[in-house]
């Protein structure tokens, strides 16, 4: 991705050049002149198409506001396509932009070798470019991609590229990855039962080739010679559902790897349950590219999905007030709708004109209402669930929990106004232990403004019982026990960072073993969550996606859009259990898990497996070796032949003799069907759920919003505001989100208020605004609150509540204990995702933490201080204070600081709580982190972690002057 050009190593070339007579175009370069070969990379919205008139690939880019305009679509070389035997690269290109007089900053051909070649100034006429490979790199065999693009000076750019040719001697050198050359004309390499299993090879493999078909365990099923020396089409006999692999052999070519494919039931023949528990987060509007919406939606359909999760952007859909442009968002939803798949959709941005003083959460309540109303009206019958925001309790929102609650109220009212039948979900909370932020949300009267309580979790299976216990207690506390519980994101972290090289250089990929781990984990997690009382779970994510600098590989599809084994596992789970009702658990034997389901026809199905790392570990699980974990067990059923399927849907038969059906459990889930008469050992009781009340005994349409002055400072966790002076100013907005005028009086508690008006009038879909001053009332620990309520047209309103903290009053009323022990490196335990050093810095009089992270990966450093009990007990602690600084603030990337109280003494073990604090600068700064804000008792804290999430490279930070503040 090229945003600035001054740092590039640029080599100027002439646009003409003669190809030496002894060189010839390599046959594989013909494959490069297709739009499918280019991956969109730009600072705008890029559409890639084939221009038949020009016989060229066309790139059309619209840029958003700003001046950083660039477009460098990536042409990734596949297996068998190597610059090792290329002497020169030749292509033609031309370009036009919205303002032709504006000109171009530059045009470049870039390579992952780090070199960029300056191209002739773009013109609206064809120019031929020739590049010598020796000017690009000294190791051409290691170049994995090139990009042809430019930096225009106006907001619309269209350019074409054609006749890409690689000239060389044509000698084969690099091994060929089978997955890169075996093709099939089906989306995602996913065949339905009734489709012909037909494959072809890229044209440049023109020599005798042997194919070998295996199952997922590597057992050979068939073999033969590829038709016409690799130039023909290979048709395999019909195969049952399952996950399969094609391998290639040749005496003339070194093939590596395999080409996997999946066989699934015909979607038109599947039973469908619109309320199915099992779902997937597709994210296709962002990850598929508009040209891929239909293909991605068809892959979802073939998995049996009835609902998927997707995204929207308010800023893109309504850049100007009242001017809507649904564009790709509508096209994406339509791609699902025409396949009978409904959508759960979310957005978590706001145009600047709607923020009304907020940093990220919209503060214009009428604007939120109108946009939500237009969404639910426009997408009626296509989008079944609307979520407002995403992970607002962490970095996706920068404003207070009270700001989120106000906007959530407005969104709910708008959604219901546009379509009363739509379901509204609260924004997915990332902190499943429900930190204080989530409590402040509900204390702002949010309970009647959503139908679905929505969470996200990325953890091992063993974490979920505690999660659900806490969630149920939370819901009971706030009177929402009857609401649906849905996890709109759950994903696997047990396999760790990708261990294989990816299709794109900086993106790592799962190894085959890691892919199988995710396949094993997925149904186990889903069934356990269902048994714990979750109402629906969306697995993250269908389409290929990388995070953590490219190290973490997500997606049930690979970067080439082929299905991983996890996709096949999900498809079969959906086919077996998507319409079934969970009855409970079975006791099948030691180390065997069994879940009992009842099918619509009254028969029963048992899902079973043997315990493995996937069941007990939160990360770094190891795939069972073939043959490990196999345990025989019996089920008491009447005599007969019963059918079942393995994890990927491949059928098997089992015979019951003498009233016993003997089966073999492995670490992979299997299903046995057609049973009857079985009783669960632990019965599952489905919760009776209801949505938000249609009517309430107060006025739901009055919504309060506050603009705090700089007399306040919002805490890093966004759950309270500290007050800097005795009398503090703020602006109160009263929004009327109804078509009726409202007259009433305000009620503000929590201190002495100056400027409170008498009776006020709020017009329909309007607001009343007033500036106020408050002298807050604080308790003995320095805690207070602002609470706004009122009575309008004779009805009470939903409240606004802002927790307050006076650090000055808290410190005066508390007892401060210095902790010089934290200066001793020996008292800290190393805990980081890379090698770290802990030392005492005499100059700074501080403990120093130094960690060298790789260029990519999950970079975190959280050294652990274990308290010596009872002398270091935190019983009665109000908070922890310390000074911190970093050697250098990272220029980019995810950067945050957390303080983690932990209820255990072991390294990386025990329940922990993630308390955010402001990320440090390169200067000494003081931090205070409350330890009494809910969720845990400070007396139970056994260790504390104080550290950072870092983008990459060297991380160095210091801590000093640690203090624990206790109540007197």
Locate each region found by the language model.
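Aromatic/acidic polysaccharide-binding cleft in carbohydrate-active enzymes
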Residues: 492-571, 585-591, 600
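N-terminal substrate-binding region of glycoside hydrolase catalytic domains
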Residues: 264-374, 387, 393
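C-terminal beta-strand-rich structural cap/linker in extracellular carbohydrate-active enzymes
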Residues: 656-705
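Carbohydrate-binding surface patches
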Residues: 587-640, 729, 735, 740-742
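Aromatic-lined carbohydrate-recognition surfaces of secreted/lumenal glycan-active proteins
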Residues: 281, 408-438, 478-496, 534-546
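Extracellular ligand-binding interfaces
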Residues: 63-139, 155-160, 165-170, 856-936, ...
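Short carbohydrate-recognition loop motifs
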Residues: 46-69, 837-860
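Active-site cleft segment of glycoside hydrolase catalytic domains centered on the general acid/base Glu
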Residues: 168, 320-323, 328, 354-473, ...
């Amino acid at each position: 991705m090229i945003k600035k050009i001054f740092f590039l190593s640029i080599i100027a070339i002439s646009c003409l050049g003669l190809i030496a007579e002894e060189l010839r175009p390599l046959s594989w370069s013909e494959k490069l002149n297709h739009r499918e070969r280019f991956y969109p990379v730009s600072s705008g919205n890029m559409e890639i198409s084939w221009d038949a008139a020009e016989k060229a690939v066309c790139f059309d880019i619209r840029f958003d506001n700003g001046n950083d305009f660039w477009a460098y679509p990536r042409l990734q070389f596949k297996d068998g396509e190597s610059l090792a035997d290329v002497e020169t690269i030749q292509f033609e290109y031309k370009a036009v932009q919205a303002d032709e007089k504006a000109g171009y900053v530059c045009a470049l051909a870039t390579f992952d070798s780090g070199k960029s070649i300056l191209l002739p100034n773009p013109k609206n006429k064809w120019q031929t470019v020739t590049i010598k490979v020796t000017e690009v790199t000294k190791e051409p065999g290691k170049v994995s991609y090139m990009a042809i693009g430019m930096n225009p000076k106006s907001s619309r750019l269209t350019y074409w590229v054609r006749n890409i040719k690689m000239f060389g001697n044509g000698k084969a050198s690099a091994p060929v990855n089978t997955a890169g050359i075996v093709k099939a004309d089906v989306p995602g390499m996913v065949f339905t039962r009734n489709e012909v299993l037909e494959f072809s090879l890229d044209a440049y493999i023109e020599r005798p080739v042997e194919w070998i078909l295996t199952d997922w365990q590597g057992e050979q099923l068939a073999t033969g010679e590829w038709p016409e020396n690799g130039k023909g089409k290979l048709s395999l006999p019909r195969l049952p559902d399952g996950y399969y692999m094609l391998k290639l052999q040749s005496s003339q070519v070194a093939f590596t790897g395999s080409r996997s494919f999946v066989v699934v039931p015909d979607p038109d023949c599947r039973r469908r349950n619109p309320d199915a528990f099992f779902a997937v987060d597709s994210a296709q509007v962002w990850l598929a590219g508009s040209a891929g919406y239909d293909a991605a939606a068809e892959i979802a359909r073939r998995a049996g999905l009835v609902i998927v999760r997707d995204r929207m952007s308010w800023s893109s859909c309504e850049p100007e007030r009242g001017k809507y442009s649904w564009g790709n968002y509508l096209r994406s939803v339509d791609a699902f709708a025409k396949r009978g798949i409904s959508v759960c959709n979310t957005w978590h941005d706001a145009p600047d004109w709607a923020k009304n003083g907020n940093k990220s959460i919209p503060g214009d309540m009428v604007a939120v209402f109108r946009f939500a109303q237009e969404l639910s009206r426009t997408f009626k019958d296509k989008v079944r669930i609307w979520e407002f925001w995403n992970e607002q309790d962490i970095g996706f929102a920068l404003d207070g929990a009270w700001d989120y609650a106000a906007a959530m109220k407005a969104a709910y009212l708008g959604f219901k106004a546009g379509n009363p039948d739509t379901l509204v979900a609260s924004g997915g909370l990332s902190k499943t232990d429900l930190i204080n932020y989530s409590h402040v949300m509900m204390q702002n009267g949010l309970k009647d403004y959503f139908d679905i309580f929505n969470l996200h979790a990325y953890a091992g299976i063993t974490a979920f019982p505690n999660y659900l216990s806490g969630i149920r207690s939370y819901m009971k506390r706030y009177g929402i026990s009857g609401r649906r519980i849905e996890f709109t994101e759950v994903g696997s972290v047990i396999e760790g960072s990708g261990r294989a090289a990816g299709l794109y250089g900086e993106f790592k990929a799962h190894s085959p073993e890691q892919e199988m781990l995710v396949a094993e984990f997925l149904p186990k997690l889903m069934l356990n969550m269902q048994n714990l009382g979750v109402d629906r779970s969306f697995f993250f994510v269908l389409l290929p996606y990388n995070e953590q600098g490219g190290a973490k590989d997500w997606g049930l599809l690979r970067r080439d859009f082929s299905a991983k084994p996890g996709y096949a596992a999900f498809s079969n789970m959906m086919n077996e259990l998507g319409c079934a009702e969970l009855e409970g658990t079975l006791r099948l034997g030691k180390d065997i898990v069994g879940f009992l389901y009842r099918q619509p026809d009254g028969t029963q199905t048992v899902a079973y497996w043997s315990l493995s790392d996937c069941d007990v570990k939160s990360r770094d699980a190891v795939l069972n070796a073939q043959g490990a974990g196999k345990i025989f067990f019996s089920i008491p059923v009447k005599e007969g032949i019963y059918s079942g399927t393995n994890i990927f849907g491949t059928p098997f038969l089992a015979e019951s003799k003498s009233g016993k059906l003997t089966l073999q459990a492995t670490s992979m889930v299997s299903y046995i069907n057609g049973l009857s008469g079985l009783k669960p050992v632990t019965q599952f009781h489905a919760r009776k759920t209801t949505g938000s009340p249609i009517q309430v005994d107060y006025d739901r349409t009055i919504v309060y919003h506050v603009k705090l002055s700089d007399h306040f400072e919002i805490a890093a966790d966004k759950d309270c505001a500290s007050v800097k002076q005795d009398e503090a100013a703020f602006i109160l907005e009263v929004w009327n989100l109804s078509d009726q005028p409202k007259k009433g009086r305000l009620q503000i508690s929590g201190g002495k208020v100056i400027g409170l008006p008498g009776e006020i009038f709020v017009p329909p879909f309007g607001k009343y605004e007033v500036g106020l001053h408050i002298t807050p009332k604080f308790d003995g620990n320095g805690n207070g609150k602002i609470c706004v309520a009122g009575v309008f047209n004779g009805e009470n309103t939903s409240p606004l509540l802002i927790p307050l903290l006076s650090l000055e009053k808290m410190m005066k009323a508390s007892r401060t204990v210095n902790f010089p022990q934290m200066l001793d490196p020996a008292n800290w335990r190393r805990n980081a995702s890379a090698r770290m050093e802990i030392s005492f810095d005499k100059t700074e009089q501080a403990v120093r933490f130094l960690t060298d992270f790789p260029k990519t990966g999950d970079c975190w450093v959280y050294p652990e201080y274990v308290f010596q009990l009872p002398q270091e007990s935190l019983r009665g602690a109000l908070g922890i204070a310390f000074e911190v600084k970093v050697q250098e603030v990272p220029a980019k990337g995810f950067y945050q600081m957390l303080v983690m109280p932990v209820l255990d003494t072991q390294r990386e073990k025990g329940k922990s709580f993630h308390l955010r604090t402001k990320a440090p600068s390169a200067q000494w700064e003081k931090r205070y982190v409350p330890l009494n804000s809910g969720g845990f008792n400070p007396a139970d804290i056994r260790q504390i972690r104080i550290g950072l999430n870092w983008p990459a490279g060297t991380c160095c930070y210091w801590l000093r002057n640690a203090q624990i503040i206790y109540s007197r």
